[in-house]
A protein has these predicted regions:
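Structural motif
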Residues: 32-34, 58-59, 89-92, 164-165
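Ordered, amphipathic secondary-structure segments that act as subunit-interaction surfaces
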Residues: 84-96
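Conserved beta-strand-loop surface patch within small alpha/beta domains used
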Residues: 18-76
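Gly/Ser/Thr-rich loops at beta-strand to alpha-helix junctions
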Residues: 39-42, 97-101
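Divalent-metal-activated hydrolytic enzyme cores
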Residues: 2-31, 66-74, 84-86, 101-185
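Short beta-strand segments
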Residues: 36-38, 62, 94-96, 166-169
């Protein structure tokens, strides 16, 4: 029985044989926008198709719950890189309905970590971080609007960057507009 790693390497070999990527694509996004969205498995391929994004169009940042924790967390740093190095001109925040993060609590994940052998001493070090991150998140649409508010308040995000908020149905790909960033500029 092949392992998942072997399957992936075989798929890559077949991809290289059958798909000649001869066109050089710039690392600078052609449509000059960044997309922050969730890492949910149902969004793989779906979000690109639903938004009409093709290889080379955008900088895509994915994390659990389309999260933004702290003024200078990793997600913000990634967005700043897209603005100041890769010259993006717009940001799209796209959450999704039925988000697993909204159904998870710090208590749940800490319990699961404990059952997998993480010591109480180690859990105490991260408990507050998980409470701050997971416990307030109960509504994906509200989260998108909160992320936009935090980005607009961030002194390092230029005021001339429209920040749009949408939410996608992970089953159909239908987008609902939550905030039109053009109306804010």
């Amino acid at each position: 029985m092949a392992t998942l790693l072997q399957e992936i390497l075989t798929n890559n070999h077949e991809f290289l044989v059958n798909n000649k990527c001869t066109k050089e694509i710039s690392k600078y996004p052609q449509k000059k926008f960044a997309l922050l969205t969730c890492m949910d498995t149902r969004l793989v391929e779906l979000i690109n198709k639903a938004l009409g994004i093709h290889r080379g169009d955008a900088k895509i940042i994915q994390n659990a719950g389309t999260s933004l924790i702290g003024e200078m967390g990793e997600t913000v740093k990634s967005l700043l890189l897209t603005i100041y190095v890769f010259d993006i001109k717009e940001i799209f925040i796209v959450g999704h309905y039925d988000c697993g993060v909204a159904l998870t609590s710090s208590k749940d994940i800490l319990h699961n970590m404990r059952s997998r052998g993480v010591s109480e001493q180690q859990l105490k070090l991260i408990e507050k971080d998980f409470q701050v991150w997971l416990d307030p998140y109960t509504d994906p649409a509200k989260n998108v609007l909160t992320v936009i508010k935090k980005l607009k308040a961030n002194p390092f995000i230029p005021n001339d960057i429209p920040i749009h908020g949408l939410i996608i149905d992970p089953h159909t790909g239908k987008l609902d507009l939550l905030e039109d960033g053009y109306k804010e500029i």
